[in-house]
């Protein structure tokens, strides 16, 4: 199945008559971008969204669920195209996430070439190779409001709405890695139960494999090497990502320090080398000292992660090779 439903027509086409693809049901949270209070990604699951958005419930999730429930094989024939400006909280539902759900294509706000871009991706003229620059969390689990109302959704200060950035160093994917809101302890396979799609995640119409990586120091610069192989029958690109885990107290479990995109023909293999210079401007080996207000070398051992997303499921880990003097 291929097609689009304009947002302004979604309610009418789907819910005004019994001949549509569904009937009115209570909407979940997260994908309802055009309601009066959009994108409610909260640790509290809002069962009655109509109370939050009286008369403006776009029923986006209910529409998707109705379409996906039309036939057992619908998930293999449906693509959900997201056009938005940020990560979206997704409900933990088999009709949306997993093998029975649709293919999900995040195109952000593509501009005037919207139609051409989406068509080229859906019909395979272009092979997707992007990686998520944000976390797509599961709705109702350990969002920032678990920290304090001042962090999310904000409070009134002198009559004006104000949000305080209380998460400190645990911004973005680090928040979920560090389980700062509770309830997000990693599963045995490395997956985070609060995350639908992790930072750095992105699929393709082909498949890639990475060999175990090697480390070496060269002229004071750390070199990480892995061989990436395109094991599918389509040309495509993978993004190799490197994270450092610092053992110093107060630091997130890991942070992105390097990445490199590699485009490969079907069956092609290529050695990829990522360089990490201790003197680089993003200070990969350092921490910021709140007392001295300056960067300094991190105390304790460093763990090196290399893979294809921020999820431990997609990473290999090694202890940092001692620097040659």
What are these regions (language model features)?
Residues 1-325:
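C-terminal non-catalytic regions of proteins with extracellular/luminal or membrane-system context
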């Amino acid at each position: 199945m291929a097609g689009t439903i304009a947002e302004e027509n979604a309610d009418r086409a789907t819910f005004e008559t019994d001949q549509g693809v569904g009937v009115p049901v209570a909407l979940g949270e997260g994908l309802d971008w055009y309601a009066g209070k959009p994108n409610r990604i909260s640790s509290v699951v809002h069962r009655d969204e109509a109370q939050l958005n009286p008369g403006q419930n776009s029923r986006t999730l209910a529409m998707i669920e109705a379409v996906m429930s039309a036939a057992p094989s619908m998930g293999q024939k449906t693509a959900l195209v997201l056009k938005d400006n940020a990560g979206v909280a997704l409900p933990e539902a088999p009709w949306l996430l997993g093998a029975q759900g649709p293919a999900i294509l995040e195109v952000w706000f593509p501009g005037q070439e919207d139609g051409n871009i989406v068509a080229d991706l859906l019909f395979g003229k272009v092979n997707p190779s992007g990686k998520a620059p944000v976390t797509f969390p599961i709705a109702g689990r350990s969002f920032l409001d678990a920290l304090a109302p001042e962090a999310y959704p904000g409070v009134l200060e002198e009559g004006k709405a104000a949000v305080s950035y209380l998460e400190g160093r645990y911004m973005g994917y680090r928040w979920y890695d560090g389980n700062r809101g509770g309830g997000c302890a990693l599963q045995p396979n490395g997956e985070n139960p609060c995350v639908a799609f992790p930072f750095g995640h992105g699929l393709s119409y082909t498949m890639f494999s990475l060999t175990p990586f090697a480390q070496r120091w060269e002229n004071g610069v750390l070199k990480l090497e892995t061989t990436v192989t395109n094991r599918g029958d389509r040309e495509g690109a993978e993004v190799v990502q490197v994270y450092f885990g610092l053992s110093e107290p107060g630091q997130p479990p890991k942070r992105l320090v390097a990445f490199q995109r590699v485009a490969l023909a079907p069956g092609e293999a290529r050695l990829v080398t990522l360089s990490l210079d201790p003197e680089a401007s993003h200070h990969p080996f350092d921490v910021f000292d709140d007392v001295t207000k300056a960067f300094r070398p991190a105390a304790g051992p460093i763990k090196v992660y290399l893979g294809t997303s921020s999820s431990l499921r997609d990473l290999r880990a090694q202890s940092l090779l001692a620097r040659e003097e």
